Amino acid sequence: MSDDARTPRGDRAGFPPTRKSLGQHFLTDRRILGRIADALHLTGSETVLEIGPGRGALTDILVERAGRLIAIEYDRALAELLRQRYAKRNNVLIAEADVLEVSLGELAAGPYVLVGNVPYYITTPILFHALVPPRAERSVYLVQKEVADRLSAAPGTKAYGALTVNVAATAKAETLFTVPAGAFAPPPKVESAVVRITPLPQPLLVPEEERPFRLLVQGAFGMRRKQMRRVLRSLYAVDAVVADEVLQGASIAPEARPETLSPAQFALVLRAFRDRKQKLAGDVMDSGGPSQAAAGE
């Protein structure tokens, strides 16, 4: 790769040295940076949230295409340098913050798109965090190829897991292209890929189901080799009879394992358990409630 295809790096651009403790690997290939910006399909009016702008290589492109740009940078030194760099840009805000502590929707204060070269050691937490409504209209991430493979994995495969299911319940994930290690400074030791996540027009879940669904899925994949009967007994503190009734209501065999269930099947389990709880509550109310016996003692 010739030098003219790369952005300035390190001290030559006046930036502080790379901090390995923050998992910093700066993308320097201008062609790939351009492809990432293209993948956002910006029209010039959008609010763009950029996670981890680093030295501003992608930011330089986005400021010319976005209506408003909010860059979230954890590294204090980089955040200050970026503020100075874009001080004359009225459409740019540099937010010095931990992205996991920020409500993305509140920060955007309206519709937004999301992009980021996220630190690989916290990629999964960031992806989960970005699923919290109000979600981006579309998101483009530079991630480990392993994560990209997990996002598109099929049930029953090794890569299939909680991340796969939670994203698929509300959005479509697609791998756009891979990125060689030589496109970064310093080069990472893993393969990378660019993925785009777009909300589904008709998601599997209604908003009030999303949090209990996420807890169910993450809990289940913590026991991915256990039978679903055992999973429900552990997660919901119910006996085998109730667990089997719930699974029967979802048309799932009690012996099935979490790693074989589709996102739609997890949604059925959640609703079957909710229906079972509502029926039990109704039965208790019809019988006068458990407190009557206690009151008579």
PLM segments and residue spans:
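Catalytic cores of RNA-modifying enzymes
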Residues: 1-219, 248-252, 259, 268-275, ...
